Design a protein with these regions (language model features):
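Secretory/exported precursors with cleavable N-terminal leaders
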Residues: 1-181
Length: 181
């Protein structure tokens, strides 16, 4: 647990077994019960990078985190085109190496749309993200120095991050853990 001016962060490292990657879920809990909006508004990439680092490990006293499920879906062709991926969406696209043209009457193919859907579910068994189980949360043992309570009884943010590369895989917030959107 690391404490900051207006929030605290709990890092939950995942057991990685044989995997060389190192994933952690970070729960960012505002000190104020109604402080999530202000926290998100003031959050920058620089603050996130400084906040989501392995800090001093302490024993967690009382730990309460509600079960939650968050999902989102959207169409992404405009975003892909803005990133320079225009050819697959055009009449000049050539998918002949992937699709037998006799199966589609010899017509040329192009991509008309791309849908992206993500979800993350956290419960007492662990975390499931993007239809693949990421692992089970395991608090590793460490030297007893102090104990701090972490009770997420009000809106909070979560970040799922690969710790070696620093890549953020998922990020979202929970306002009402009973809602699935």
């Amino acid at each position: 647990i690391s404490s900051h001016d207006s929030f605290k962060v709990l890092r939950l490292p995942y057991s990685n077994g044989q995997d060389a990657r190192s994933f952690s879920m970070y729960i960012i809990l505002p000190n104020e019960k109604a402080g999530l909006f202000a926290l998100e508004k003031g959050l920058t990439v620089d603050i996130l990078e400084k906040t989501l680092v392995k800090g001093v490990e302490v024993d967690v006293g009382t730990f309460k985190l509600p079960k939650f499920k968050v999902s989102a879906g959207y169409e992404v062709p405009d975003t892909l085109k803005e990133m320079g991926m225009k050819l697959p969406f055009s009449d000049e696209a050539d998918f002949s190496g992937m699709v037998d043209s006799s199966s589609n009457g010899g017509h040329a193919l192009s991509i008309s749309n791309v849908f992206h859907k993500t979800f993350i579910e956290v419960n007492e068994e662990g975390t499931e993200a993007a239809a693949a189980t990421a692992g089970v949360v395991v608090l590793r043992s460490f030297v007893l120095r102090s104990s701090e309570d972490f009770i997420a009884d009000h809106p909070f943010m979560f970040v799922l991050k690969e710790d070696i590369t620093g890549i953020i895989v998922f990020m979202g917030h929970v306002v009402n853990p009973l809602s699935t959107s």
